[in-house]
Every structure is written in structure tokens, then in C-alpha cells.
From Swiss-Prot:
One of its GO terms (biological process) is carbohydrate metabolic process. SUPFAM superfamilies: Aldolase (SSF51569). HAMAP family: Transaldolase_1. This is Transaldolase. The keyword Transferase applies. The active site is at K132 (schiff-base intermediate with substrate). GO terms for molecular function: transaldolase activity. Gene3D superfamilies: Aldolase class I. It is an enzyme of class 2 (transferase). It catalyses: D-sedoheptulose 7-phosphate + D-glyceraldehyde 3-phosphate = D-erythrose 4-phosphate + beta-D-fructose 6-phosphate. Its main location: cytoplasm.
Length: 327
């Protein structure tokens, strides 16, 4: 029998979740996702110094002030890693805008346009880029604007059905509901007694979103993310896409147990699901009612913002070193 990895590829598009191009290459996945946290882990490794140095030199050549230069460099780093990753896969890569813009629609639109244009100017195919936008109300409004301009968006940090519904209304290309972080919250809040893979709250959340989307023929793709175990991945076999860490992908490759399809369009259409009438007030109220979604969205933004600041600090030091050498 073939590996679980090969079996799963017949049911879902597998995506490698890492900032390391070499790991993407060995993963055998279709697409790849990354973020400031993942890029931070690999950007300072000696084997990637050339990409980092080139991004810094390019940013300095734009002749902006210190803040602008840092912005240029950070986006160029993402683009460089994204383009390197695309050499290793046939599909798309997701790159993320600065999480500190999460509550400013106009700023997110401007940054996403800049990132997309830089990606194309650096030799990338626009059709192979997904721009990651946080699932705040403001972020989802930015997505609606960007999709109309031909910029495909991946709405990330999805923890609640209402976020998914709002993203669908904005005609987002794709959403990323976070399985593991939902599970983490419930374990921290109520302990781990009584949870099995069949009652895993993260798995249940994605299953509910899948049912809603397929019931109403919503074209926005669902890419389940943030897995804590191989079992969580397998519990969502049949989801449009699954973005999985290299470690868990390796576990799937080593196991030849049979894989069963868990999510199915025909079955979803049979279920009794009522459409939700979306307004901003409904969105904000339902998010407020969901302590888990509210807390994990806020935490996710803080984590990505913090990692961006750490990456900024490292880049600032590199810029100083280059300036000192040129002095």
C-alpha cells in the first residue's frame, strides 16, 4: 500500500508550511505557505545569506527614509524566499503582509499591492502568489478590494465560521482556519480529558466551515492549517487544501495505514444548514460571543507582529553593518 502522504494527495492538495526552500523541495507538496515567524527561523542561516544580503542592498537602493527602507527590505526578503520556494513546487506560495496593519484597511490594501507588484517585478508570476491578510473585519474589507484588482488573497487566522462567511462574501480566493490553535485554546481552558480526534474542536471548526461552503456552493477554497498531530491532518482528509509542517509530512510518508476521506461535498450538501445574513455588527457580535476566536485572533496578530519586529531588528543590524562597510 502507498504511504498516507500519497493517499492523502488524492483527496486534498497538500501544502508545505515552512520558510525553508530546501524543506519545501523535499516535501513533495503542491503549494507552500510561509509567514514572518517561519522566515525568521531560516533567514539568518548561512545558506540563505545571499538572499538576505540582496534584499537589504535592494532596499537601500530605493533611497527611502529609515522606516521606508526597512519596509522595502522586509517585503523583498519575503519575495526572495517566495520565489526560491516556487522553484521547488508547481503551485502557489502564500506571503504575508505586516500584521501590525491588521486594523487598517487602506494600509493593508496599499501594502498588498506593493508586495504583489514587487513579486512580479522580481520575476514572479502573479497567478502563483497568494497574499495573506488577517481575518479581522478590516482585513476582510481589504480582501474584497484586492480581489477586485486581481490580487488573490489567503485570509489567515480564521477561528470562527463568521470569519469564513465574511471572507466568502468578500470573494477571497482562499481561507486558512487554524486547527491546532483552536485545539490549544480548548485544552488550556478546560483540560485535555475527554477529547478524541472525533471531538477535536479544531477539526470540528474546519468541518463546519467546509459544510457551510459546500452547502451553498461557495468557491472560496479552504486550507486547513496549524496542525498539532498527524491525526488532525487525517481527520480532515478531503478538505480543499491542507497546509502541514515538514515534520508531519514526513510522518505521513512513513505510515502506510489506509486513509479515509472525511470531508465530502455530496455529504455536506445533505446537511440542514441555514445561511447567515452578514453585516459588520453581526460579525463583531458573533466574534465577541466566541471567546476562543477573539483571543486566538488577537494572539495570532501579536505573535506575527512580534516576529516581524524581531526580523526588523535583525535586518536593521545588517543595514548598519553594510553602511559601516561603505563608509
Amino acid at each position: 500500500m502507498s504511504s498516507q502522504f500519497e493517499q492523502l494527495k488524492l483527496l486534498s492538495v497538500l501544502v508545505c508550511d515552512t520558510g525553508d526552500p530546501e524543506l519545501v523541495k523535499s516535501s513533495g507538496s503542491q503549494d507552500a505557505t510561509t509567514n514572518p515567524s517561519l522566515i525568521l527561523k531560516v533567514a539568518q542561516e548561512p545558506k540563505y545569506q545571499e538572499m538576505l544580503t540582496e534584499a537589504i542592498a535592494w532596499g537601500i537602493r530605493q533611497n527611502g527614509d529609515d522606516v521606508q527602507t526597512l519596509t522595502f527590505v522586509l517585503d523583498k526578503i519575503q519575495v526572495n524566499f517566495g520565489l526560491e520556494i516556487l522553484k521547488c513546487i508547481p503551485g502557489r506560495v502564500s506571503l504575508e503582509i505586516d500584521a501590525r496593519l491588521s486594523f487598517n484597511t487602506e494600509a493593508m490594501v496599499q501594502r498588498a499591492i506593493f508586495l504583489s507588484e514587487l513579486f512580479v517585478a522580481s520575476g514572479g508570476d502573479k497567478k502563483r502568489l497568494l497574499v495573506k491578510i488577517p481575518g479581522t473585519w478590516e482585513g476582510i474589507q481589504a480582501v474584497e478590494i484586492l480581489e477586485k484588482q486581481g490580487i488573490s488573497c489567503n485570509v489567515t487566522l480564521i477561528f470562527n465560521l463568521i470569519q469564513a462567511i465574511a471572507a466568502a462574501k468578500a470573494k477571497a480566493t482562499l481561507i486558512s482556519p487554524f486547527v491546532g490553535r483552536i485545539y490549544d485554546w480548548w485544552i488550556a481552558a478546560y483540560g485535555d480529558e475527554g477529547y478524541s480526534i472525533d471531538t477535536d474542536p479544531g477539526v470540528a471548526s474546519v468541518s463546519n466551515i467546509y459544510t457551510y461552503y459546500k452547502k451553498f456552493d461557495i468557491p472560496t477554497q479552504i486550507m486547513a492549517a496549524s496542525f498539532r498531530s498527524k491525526e488532525q491532518v487525517l481527520a480532515l482528509a478531503g478538505c480543499d487544501l491542507l497546509t502541514v509542517s515538514p515534520k508531519l509530512l514526513d510522518e505521513l510518508k512513513k505510515d502506510q495505514s489506509s486513509v479515509t476521506k472525511k470531508l465530502d461535498v455530496a455529504e455536506a450538501k445533505k446537511l440542514d444548514v441555514q445561511p447567515v445574513e452578514l453585516t459588520e455588527s453581526v460579525f463583531r457580535f458573533l466574534m465577541n460571543e466566541d471567546a476562543m476566536a477573539t483571543e486566538k485572533l488577537a494572539e495570532g496578530i501579536r505573535i506575527f507582529s512580534g516576529d516581524t519586529q524581531i526580523l526588523e531588528a535583525a535586518v536593521t543590524e545588517f543595514i548598519k553593518q553594510i553602511a559601516a562597510q561603505d563608509a
